[in-house]
Design a protein with these regions (language model features):
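Secondary-structure end/capping motifs
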Residues: 82-186
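A bilobed periplasmic-binding-protein/Venus flytrap-type ligand-binding module shared by bacterial periplasmic
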Residues: 68-85, 99
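Short, small-residue-biased leader/transition segments that mark boundaries at the very start
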Residues: 1-3
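Short helix-initiation/N-cap motifs at beta->coil->alpha
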Residues: 11-32, 43
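Conserved C-terminal helix/tail region of periplasmic/extracytoplasmic solute-binding proteins
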Residues: 160-251
Length: 251
């Protein structure tokens, strides 16, 4: 959000007021004028356009095509205590991703997600492909990449880029020991085992470099230089972040 603001000569600290509100509340706040806009994915942006309360300025694919979305996270002590369950859970998510990637299942998934327990909105507002907000044509191109070569594989380079952005806006000091931290939190080995057991052939797949709309190349080998070359950033610090030893799971 802050990076996209900067690309349009908007200083996110000076020119706008950013606040966090629940996704389900965003449309109501936009309708009554409590906010001027919001940054969110489907179905809330599509619904605003369909109901005439707003319009998308830019989509996420225009900002960072192929960007990471949701993650499956687990506490380290639990993962150590139950390694087989951790792998089985990862396999289940991979199989679910493969199911969601098939357009033949999109109508079923829209019906499921429309339930009050989940999104609580009309199924036709829940899309899985790239379409015009004013037309109901069947999408030929998926918007969300649920499954495919390297799509689900954890990427430490992407984790590292996110760390640089948190430091860029002074949310955290940039960790001097970022390699150690990424090795602890990005469980590539668990994914590799799960993928291998499912017969997937993308265990060793390597993603291409991170390419954002601003055209500034991200050098994962020198994140500090990357931060320093950004035209606007807050004063950031670099510090050793103690990570400690994995704690034992309480019995």
């Amino acid at each position: 959000m802050c990076s996209s603001d900067l690309s349009n000569a908007i200083d996110p600290d000076r020119d706008v007021h950013l606040q966090t509100i629940p996704p389900a509340q965003m449309l109501a706040d936009l309708k009554d004028g409590s906010i001027d806009g919001y940054c969110i994915g489907d179905p809330w942006n599509f619904r605003a356009a369909r109901e005439g309360h707003g319009f998308p300025i830019a989509g996420d694919l225009e900002i960072w095509s192929g960007h990471p979305g949701k993650v499956l996270g687990a506490r380290e002590d639990w993962a150590i205590a139950y390694p087989n369950t951790h792998i089985a859970l990862t396999k289940a998510v991979l199989e679910a991703c493969r199911y969601c990637a098939d357009p033949a299942h999109w109508d079923e998934l829209s019906q499921l997600l429309s339930d009050r327990r989940y999104l609580g909105m009309k199924p036709e507002l829940i899309r899985f492909g790239v379409t015009d907000a004013n037309h109901d044509t069947s999408p030929a191109e998926p918007h969300t990449l649920f499954f495919g070569p390297g799509v689900n594989r954890p990427s430490r380079s992407e984790h590292l880029w996110i760390l640089t952005q948190l430091a860029r806006w002074s949310e955290i000091p940039f960790p001097r020991n970022y390699v150690e931290i990424l090795e602890r939190i990005c469980a590539v080995g668990v994914y590799s085992t799960a993928a291998r057991e499912l017969g997937l052939d993308d265990v060793t797949y390597q993603r291409s470099g991170i390419e954002l709309f601003d055209g500034v190349p991200f050098n994962a080998d020198d994140p500090i230089s990357y931060l320093n070359q950004l035209s606007i950033h807050k004063d950031f610090s670099v510090a050793e972040i103690p990570v400690g030893v994995p704690r034992a799971l309480a019995s």
